[in-house]
A protein has these predicted regions:
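Short, basic/aromatic recognition patches
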Residues: 1-23
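Electropositive phosphate-/nucleotide-binding environments in soluble metabolic enzymes
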Residues: 1-8, 42, 46, 105-109
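Short beta-strand scaffold segments in enzyme catalytic cores
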Residues: 23-27, 31
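Generic structural signal for well-ordered beta-strand positions
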Residues: 34-35
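A short, polar/charged loop-to-alpha-helix boundary motif
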Residues: 40-57
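Flexible, glycine/charged-enriched surface loops at secondary-structure junctions
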Residues: 20-23, 60-68, 122
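C-terminal binding/interaction regions
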Residues: 63, 71-158
């Protein structure tokens, strides 16, 4: 609803200011608010998705669900072989990495099992999302909105 949308907007803007990086906020079905920010390996939409799944699964937010040993080769593939300027994983790529991790990591499997609970949630981002990220969020049934600004260094786009 409207209240959830405002909570998501407020949370994303506060996280962006605190982190000095693009961020997102989401209101979960129980009213909890979770945030995610752009990092070296993940875009804001991917980070928010992982953090939401952790919160829904009761998983420690400080726990890495996906090993950097899994993430880093994907980032290298994107920039080296595929020639992308943006090494960060989009939300669809991080979900694939989560599914692979879930094969050997029961905590990652628990997080993956939370995906259906995202349907109907409100999320807001402090920058315009890539088409890939926006489409994935919509496929998951998440209501998405964005600030009308682009990432300055264009690190966030395909």
């Amino acid at each position: 609803g409207t209240t959830d949308r405002w909570l998501a907007i407020s949370a994303s803007l506060e996280r962006e200011e605190a982190a000095c990086a693009p961020a997102g906020g989401m209101v979960l079905p129980d009213g909890q608010v979770v945030t995610g920010r752009t990092s070296d390996l993940l875009g804001a939409s991917a980070a928010l998705l992982i953090n939401a799944l952790k919160r829904l699964g009761g998983i420690d937010q400080d726990l890495d669900l996906i090993s950097t040993h899994v993430l880093e080769p994907i980032c290298r593939l994107k920039t080296g072989v595929l020639g992308n300027k943006n090494p960060r994983l989009h939300s669809d790529e991080v979900l694939i990495a989560l599914c692979v991790s879930a094969l050997t990591n029961p905590i990652a499997a628990m997080a993956q099992a939370q995906l259906p609970k995202l349907r109907g949630c409100d999320a807001h981002f402090t920058v315009v999302l890539s088409d890939v990220d926006e489409k994935l969020y919509r496929r998951l049934g998440i209501h998405v909105s964005c600030e009308p600004k682009y990432e300055r260094q264009r690190l966030y786009f395909k």
